[in-house]
Amino acid sequence: MSAQSVEEDSILIIPTPDEEEKILRVKLEEDPDGEEGSSIPWNHLPDPEIFRQRFRQFGYQDSPGPREAVSQLRELCRLWLRPETHTKEQILELVVLEQFVAILPKELQTWVRDHHPENGEEAVTVLEDLESELDDPGQPVSLRRRKREVLVEDMVSQEEAQGLPSSELDAVENQLKWASWELHSLRHCDDDGRTENGALAPKQELPSALESHEVPGTLNMGVPQIFKYGETCFPKGRFERKRNPSRKKQHICDECGKHFSQGSALILHQRIHSGEKPYGCVECGKAFSRSSILVQHQRVHTGEKPYKCLECGKAFSQNSGLINHQRIHTGEKPYECVQCGKSYSQSSNLFRHQRRHNAEKLLNVVKV
């Protein structure tokens, strides 16, 4: 098989929109020997995420032979990692980022990818921002609960847009709700259901979707699977489920009949059906369904870091980055282990510490 026919096959087996197909065709015509170093400006190529997905989804049956398969994989990998413009460290970060997102629960994968992080640190910041939104102790309980509902609705809506079965969507929503309760118990209560000052924790309202006693199998944010209803911060009988009969969901989606208590939530939901992404980036053309996501994305282009530390002047693109940094100056360690009392300034460090406790428990079981 000639080199020209191989190149034509490379084009045919990659289903792309017209513009992307034209770009790939021009590239191959200008570089017929398959050598590295295309004359096409890299900033004119499609989103690297497109090529990453094609690289991972490529099958042997998609090529006429092993040599062609390797050639096509090499080309897709190069279009994804872009060694002509990226340093070795940046390429390493891209691979680490891909694996990090892959090990997240499905609902968090969607959330992170929708924010388009360019490295592992940005992905962590996205999750920490979500965590602070779900469980900010400085806000009234009613506001935290409402934020939690909106974020859950947002994540579930994104999963609906990708066609997840309703049973999986229910599991996603339950996991998100339970995760916020788990985080609350980790930070504010000990194993006997007491708060940090020794008083009994007030009765908590169990999220309505979580009537069963078993915790969902996959917990968000890396929380160890050591909690069950009736243990640790929430002893049996401590939950009270309350209903507000006067609360009605008056906003109905004409497409699917789903009800919403807020008109703004209905508007966001309807974008699932319409595919509307009204917030477009003028720099690269990417579009987003929410203005807040666009604002975060634009900082990639502008380098804007609006959150500045008053102590040392260091600036951050995300508020959560500033909050974490300020603990260096204050010495604050708000994340406390409920088993041994050790405190940490970062939630990720607490989760790693908790896993060590779990490992010790497993070793004790094995020894017995």
UniProtKB/Swiss-Prot annotation:
Domain of life of the native organism: Eukaryota
InterPro entries xref list: SCAN_dom, SCAN_sf, Znf_C2H2_sf, Znf_C2H2_type
Short name of any one Pfam family annotated for the protein: SCAN
GO biological process: myelination; negative regulation of DNA-templated transcription; positive regulation of transcription by RNA polymerase II; regulation of transcription by RNA polymerase II
Zinc fingers (C2H2-type), renumbered ranges: 251-273, 279-301, 307-329, 335-357
Tissue specificity remark: Expressed in many tissues except in heart.
Phosphoserine PTM sites in chain numbering: 132, 142, 274, 292
Residue numbers of Phosphotyrosine PTMs: 335
Residues in cross-link Glycyl lysine isopeptide (Lys-Gly) (interchain with G-Cter in SUMO1): 27
One MF term in the entry's GO annotations: identical protein binding
Protein task: Transcription factor required for myelination of differentiated oligodendrocytes. Required for the conversion of oligodendrocytes from the premyelinating to the myelinating state. In the developing central nervous system (CNS), involved in the maintenance in the progenitor stage by promoting the cell cycle. Specifically binds to the 5'-TCAT-3' DNA sequence. Has transcription repressor activity in vitro.
PANTHER family: C2H2-TYPE DOMAIN-CONTAINING PROTEIN-RELATED (PTHR23235:SF178), KRUEPPEL-LIKE TRANSCRIPTION FACTOR (PTHR23235)
Protein name: Zinc finger protein 24
This protein's encoding gene: ZNF24
